[in-house]
Amino acid sequence: MNGVLGVGPAFPPRPFFIEAGKKQIGLRQLALRGRQLALALACMLFLLPGTASSHDASSYGGVFRSRDLGAAWLNADVGLFLNAALVIAVDPRDSSHLLVGTDLGILSSRNGGRSWVPEGRDVIIGAVFALAFSPDGELAMCAATSGVFLRNQNGWRRAEAPSSAIPARALVAGAAKDRFYLLGRSRLFASQDGGRSFAVVPGLSQTSEMTALVAIPGSADLLAAVIDSRAMISDDGGRNWRNTGFGGADAPVDMIAADATRPQRIWAAAGGRIVVSDNLGADWHSIGRSLPLPEARVRGIAASADATTLVVSSDRGVYRSEDGGQTWAPKEDNLPIHIEAGPLARDPNDAGVIYAVFSLMPYAEVWRTAVEGGNLLARIDTISLAGGLSFCVLMLIGGVLAALHLSRRRATTHSLR
C-alpha cells in the first residue's frame, strides 16, 4: 500500500519492466493480467459439469441401493464424496448396518447409509477390496493393503495371515462356525478360529490362479470359484476341485455367484453371456442374450427366484432385464453411467434389496497400486511430470524476478536518502 496514508518512500521507485519483444510489461500490468486469467479459469471450472458441488452421480463413485431388485436406485452414501467404493457388506443381524471398503479404508453406517463414520483408521490402511460378516453378525472381517483384520466387540485388530494373502480379492464366511475363507492374489486361505488366523489351503497347484470365490449356502465346506478362467466346485473346503465344464482360455469366466433363494443354483458370466446352473455346475444353460456390450466384464449378478428379473453389474455400469435376459437395459437413473461398478451385495433379510458400488478410479488401477505397495510415483505419467516441472520452473522465475525488483527498490530508496 505504498503512498497511502503517508506510508512508503517520498518518491516513487523506478518501475520494473520485463522486455517482451518490442513491448515493455510492468509489474502492475502483469498482476492485472494474472488476475484476469485467474478469473477466466475460475469461470471455466465453475461451468464444467464435473466440478459441481452437489453429489452428482456422474461426478463421483459411491454406494447406491435398490429396494425393488434394481428397478430404481438411490444414493446410500449421504454426505460422502467417494473416489473409489470397492466392496460393500450387509450385517445379517441388522440390515441397517453397512460396511463399505474404499481406496482409503473402511466406512460404517448404522442407519442404512444416512450417515457414515470411518472405522479402524489406526490399523486399517489403504484400499479394502474384501469384506465379510459372520453368519450371526457377531464378527466382521476385512482385507486391506496393510493386512487382514478382524472386528469383534473390542474393535478392529490384526489377524495372522501370510504375506501372500494381501491384497485379497474376496472374503467369505463359511456355513461352519468360526469358518472364513480368503482369496488372496491367486491362492486360497482358510480360518477355523473365527478369523484370528489364516493358513493356505493345500490342493491347488502352484501354476493355477484363482480369481473369484463364493461360499454356497447349506454346506459347511461347499465352495465355488473361478480357477484358470474356469468355473470350479469344491465340496471339501477347497482341497479338491471339480471342473464344471464352463469357461476356459477361449472364454474366460469373469465371476461366479451363489443364488440368494436357491442353494443349489449358481451363476457365472463370460464374454457378456450370463449362465446358470441349478445343480451346482453339473449342467449350465444360457440366460437370454448377451449383454449389449459383450466386452463388458461382469462383477455381480442378482436374480429373482424365477430368474426372469436379472441385475448385472460390470465395468460398463449396471444392466437389468425383466424378461429372462432377452432384452437388457442400462440403468442410468441416479446411477453413474461412465464409471465402473463393483460387486453387488444383497440384504440377507430381504432379497429385493441390492447394493451397488462404483469407483471413479478403474478397479484394475486400484488393484495394481495395492499390489505394488501404493507407490504413487509409479502412477505419474510423462505429461503430468512435465506439467509439474514446468510449474516449478515458472514459480522459480517468478521468485527471481520478484527478488530483483525488491533489490532495485531498496537500492533506489537508499540512494534517495
Residue map of PLM features:
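Extracellular glycan-interacting surfaces
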Residues: 3, 17, 25, 33-417
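Positively charged N-terminal leader segments that act as targeting/secretion signals
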Residues: 4-16, 29
